[in-house]
Amino acid sequence: MNVPKNIIVHHTAVSREKNSNQFEATDNYHKSKGWGKIGYQYLIEPDGTVKQGRADNELGAHTSQKNMNYLSLGICLTGDFDIEEPTKEQCIALQELIRRKQTEYTILDANVVPHRHYAPKSCWGNKLPTDILSYLTKRTMADTQQLADWQNTAIQFIKDTGISDGSRPLETVTRVEMFEMIRKFYLYTVNKK
């Protein structure tokens, strides 16, 4: 019996525009590989509909590395997140599903990871950060949170100086990204003298 201690998030790697019925297509593809049925426990459609694949206690077929099929729930979002982002509805549904399953199975935040954490793939998409929970928090509150005047001023300065394009102002940055911003700011101040 599978008792999940991890949640692994995937994408179908098929653009929403190319196939609107990805649950059935994914199920058929997985069956063609001899897996019996869809390998994920859940699949989330663009409108936020959560579809059950395998039962939570059923062995998954989504992440073979480090026996993760035995130790995790596989949640897949429809879309190709190497070229597009999940819809807000998908983010809300994913966030709610993750929180519910974390409570149900005592899964730590650190154990909610993208597929690429275990496999040499881009999955859950190159356009998306590794920190799934922070990303979801920002995406689900983005429409309701207004930036303060000082924040808008700072963003405009960053855009005007070419340090950043100012997009996704509430998203965290890696140390390497911060170093690059500092380097650009240094060059801006040196050239301004």
What are these regions (language model features)?
Residues 5-7, 38-40, 73, 176:
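Residue-level detector of short, conserved catalytic/binding motifs and their immediate flanks
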Residues 19-22, 26, 90-97, 150-154, ...:
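Stable alpha-helical elements in mature extracytoplasmic
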Residues 36, 68-70, 150:
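Short, flexible loop/turn motifs enriched in small residues
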Residues 1-16, 20, 46-71, 77-142:
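Basic/polar, cationic surfaces and motifs that engage anionic cell-wall
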Residues 140-193:
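Short, solvent-exposed alpha-helical surface patches in non-cytosolic proteins
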Residues 18-37, 43:
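Glycan-recognition patch characteristic of GH18 chitinases/ENGases
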Residues 34-41, 105-115, 167:
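Surface-exposed patches in mature extracellular/periplasmic domains of secreted proteins
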Residues 26-33, 61, 97-104, 135, ...:
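Structured segments of extracytoplasmic/periplasmic soluble domains
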